[in-house]
Amino acid sequence: MRRFALIAAGLATVAAAGCSSSSSSTPRSGSSPATGTITVFAAASLTEAFTKIGQQFQAAHKGDTAKFSFGPSSGLATQITSGAPADVFASASPGTMQDVVSAGDASNPQNFAKNFAEVAVPPNNPANVDSVTDLAKHSVKVALCQPQVPCGSVAAEVFKNAGITVKPVTLQPDVKSVLTQVETGNVDAGMVYVTDVMAAGSKAKGITIPASDNASTLYPMATVSSSNHKSIAQQFVAYVLSPAGQQVLAAAGFQKP
């Protein structure tokens, strides 16, 4: 009898432990991952806007977290197609997004913003740059994005429209790196986006490019096919497209696509 009681008690303990384990491991309703964390790969030019959108998203979706990896769109695309864990990809170029879609790593991208090029110079404008054509002068030290990066492609289009040839002293991996070159005074000018000049504040000054010479780029976004957090990823995409997300983008200088 005593042996039976001990066995019964042991079974009761196991059953209780099993119920406790099942309860604690059950994910929240409507959320596939237990942690509620997504990783967003986003173009460097989205740094300020997406950081704020992420904060608002988390406030509106308690328990969910958005972590960001900002960088050159082409580099982020290569990481995704090489198997890097990501849940959302926001590119500064439809072409770069198409590379990811063609590889089967994303589908149904949606354009959520548009950006235009602008010349950035140090606050004191040491080279007296007044227009984009001044970048063709040999005396002006210019920083550009690498040609395969969206901001590099946009700059090339601007130069073609303006009928000038620019020989940069440095090629940078992304637009924020170009802006840093300007802010630190390493160069006299850099080709960035309107949003980057706004984000720089007093650290840089913008030189407007005439509409006839300027070029723009669209920003598409999609969930990554291999995501284990598709529900939250789709909610984040929806938030960026929502009036709240669009308001943040507009305040940062982005235009509607």
Predicted features by range, described:
Residues G104, N108-Q110:
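Central helical "cap/lid" subdomain
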Residues M1-A8:
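Bacterial N-terminal signal peptides that target proteins for export
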Residues C19-A59, T65, S74, T78-T81, ...:
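Exported/periplasmic ABC-transporter solute-binding proteins
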Residues A12-T13, M97:
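Alpha-helical transmembrane segments and their juxtamembrane interfaces
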Residues V14-G18:
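C-terminal motif of bacterial Sec signal peptides marking the signal peptidase cleavage site
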